[in-house]
Amino acid sequence: MTDLPALLVAAPIFGSVTVLLAGLLRERTGWPLTVLASLVQVGGAVALAAQAFGDEPVRYVVGGFTAPFGIELVVDGLSATMVVLIAVVSLGVLGYARAAGPRSNVFYATYLLLVAGLTGMSITSDVFNMYVFLEITGLAAYALVASGEGGESALAALKYLLVGTVGASLFLLGIGYAYIGTGTLNMTDLSGQLATLGYTTPLVQASFGLLVAGLFVKIAVFPVHTWQPDAYANAPDSVSAFISALVSTVAAYALARIVFSVFTVEFLLANAFAQSVLVAGAVVSIVFGSVLAVTQTELKRMLAYSSVSQFGLVVGAIAVANGTALTGAMIHLVGHAIMKGGLFLTCGLVATETGARTVEEYDGLVERFPLGAGAFAVLAFAMVGVPPAVGFVGKWYVALGAVEAAAAALAVVVLV
């Protein structure tokens, strides 16, 4: 048994505390310590992924208390991909933050705390432990959004806090219902207990509904997306890039884990209505997110609404629950994280160089800042799914999966 899973959660937490304490002695310690912690995170993530892509998942039992009574961390190929994505993206955005800000020790400490929360959500095999990391992620994200200058950032963070608290509370209630019916929190054990209890039992159905509703808020699926446009638009550019790339991405990954590792495909087969609601929610999110995106004048707000649409696609893939669609969902999750983070970073660079932040102000950008215009164009085309970009590949597999599942409405909105 390797200690790497635990170290990948503990290292950024330790780094966060170290940054705060070192800052009491010397002001400019936050940057080098955060870079060091991030490099350790990347190295550990790559090493763990190399093991996880072997024959069996990597498992770590916290405190020596074996599952189902103790907390188990499990890293398979899917969660290893998420861990590497989190580590690499966070290091990349950190480099931009050094130039564009914020640069305070509190910012760096909170940044590392968010990395810890996202990593923990990705590798835990305990639903209550997932809730704990969900809360850590939320609190760190709220603080980072509020780190911008001016009252708009604080107001956006407050809105994010209020809506996010509702989502976390729904998720916790869902855990409570599951625990009442089964007496366990370990995902593997819980899956078996739920099957024994019966997938059509009202308690099991209520637990599923609450867990999914809570994660819908965190993912920002329409119409519970209201926190996202303000948060992305008013946060510092580096924070917008960081949270847009990873926060909803990891929440969508958590949804996939809850649906397939805890409730399983058999639950969806036994509850056709629940599956239909998931598909309908995905279709609505794709359509309304796209419509709202094209009506925006501010670039960052447009990109935020684009995320509402893009994650509707991922939710739809999870809902149809076949291998083709899920392959597309995972490709799209990784691709979206890189593309959307890159788009927000490009918006920040363009604003720094030219002051342009609206669609109208981007007119003639190719003459004023050709590098920024080129980068934005390439990333935007990839995002909308122009072949052969990764955005096209993910959408194509999701559409094929929707056709296989006879989900015609989903297939149409994905392809259109």
What is each model feature region?
Residues M1-T2, G63-T81, G192-F208, N271-S276, ...:
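Short aromatic-rich membrane-water interface segments that cap or initiate transmembrane helices
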Residues T2-A109:
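Transmembrane helix-loop-helix hairpins at membrane boundaries of multipass inner-membrane proteins
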Residues A6, A10, A50-G54, R59-V61, ...:
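Specific lipid-exposed transmembrane alpha-helices and their immediate membrane-water interface residues
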Residues A22, R26-T29, R103-L113, G117-T200, ...:
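Alpha-helical multi-pass transmembrane bundles of energy-transducing inner-membrane proteins
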Residues G30-V35, L155-K159, A235-A245, T327, ...:
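Membrane-interface alpha-helices at helix entry/exit sites of multi-pass transporters
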Residues G54-E72, G183-G198, I258-N271, T327-G328, ...:
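Membrane-interface helix termini and inter-helical loops of multi-pass transporters
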Residues G64, G209-V277, A304:
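Short helix-boundary/re-entrant hairpin motifs in multi-pass inner-membrane proteins
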Residues L144, Y232, V315-T324, G394-A411:
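Interfacial segments of multi-pass membrane proteins
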